[in-house]
């Protein structure tokens, strides 16, 4: 069954955003990579500002999608900057992902979180699986948004 899953879905990105008791935010991303990939290829996950970014003045962001396009537009950093300038994390993520789509036909997904605990799971891909835990409550559907 694991081989079937891998052959259909490949190695997917796992991302996380978190907030501590003092209101500091953090983001992390890990990826199985794009297949087939060139030897030495580095995707967006380890690139700060590309696929992962966190700034207490804006928001924490973890991205998934075609890394080269995400890096080229520094999407995670852009989302945080829009948030810092006053947009909600949902509006900030939507604006940045739409710019990526319109500018270079880049498709991506993001999870975002700011210091106030406002979060968003958003994507322009065919699908994106995500979840959110706040305390002992788990939420997904009310904040999961697809942009076209």
Task: Identify the residue ranges that each predicted region occupies.
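N-terminal nucleophile
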Residues: 1-148
């Amino acid at each position: 069954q694991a081989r079937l899953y891998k052959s259909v879905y490949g190695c997917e990105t796992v991302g996380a955003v978190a907030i501590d008791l003092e209101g500091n935010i953090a983001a992390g991303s890990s990826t199985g990579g794009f297949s087939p990939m060139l030897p030495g290829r580095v995707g967006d996950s380890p690139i700060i500002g590309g696929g992962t970014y966190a700034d207490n003045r804006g928001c924490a962001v973890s991205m998934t999608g075609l890394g080269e396009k995400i890096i080229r537009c520094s999407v995670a950093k852009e989302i945080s900057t829009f948030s810092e300038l006053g947009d909600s994390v949902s509006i900030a993520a939507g604006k940045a992902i739409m710019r990526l789509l319109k500018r270079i036909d880049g498709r991506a997904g993001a999870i975002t979180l700011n210091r106030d605990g406002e979060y968003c799971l958003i994507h322009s891909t065919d699908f994106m699986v995500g979840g959110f835990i706040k305390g002992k409550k788990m939420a997904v559907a009310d904040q999961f948004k697809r942009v076209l």
